[in-house]
């Protein structure tokens, strides 16, 4: 299973588990290029400015999905471990994603205010068991916020390289020593995973088991980053 997976959904309501897969990337773009830099053909200029290559790989893809949940076992299915949870209601017309999350303390990505616990209607009130913290609610009712209904932040990464080829004709006509400078995530762009419902991090838990609002880090992005900070390495390579 993936870290954003929920291992077992409600067997009696299979329709609520119908969604994009846990590893879905709706859009992915990868652009790579290698350029042999033009330089002088002879003399000192060739020795210093000749033989350079510049390369880069740019990647941009959509985020992976995640699922907002209610903690505990409000449905009373009495499964063990991570198989116990409830589904909240999404308020119609409310965008659950905080698009300004980078400027929000705690990197809050999910607008928890866009969700409520399922509420009892007159038609079903007699069959409902209320959350202890929310009178008039219905803990044994599934909400409308479906599986993988929130898409996490996109991933952006750019790797850059510089190569200097130095011919070594004493070895062979094609031999050269290549100096390599490689910069991974050269822009040092932070890429976060989505708020996760389980695997020890409960950022996608919107409400506690009693129906009260979950505190920090509810709605916050996952740590650590899904890509490493800028990494630079140098190498010499003999090619013949």
Functional labels for PLM-detected ranges:
Residues 1-240:
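Short, solvent-exposed micro-motifs at the edges of structured domains
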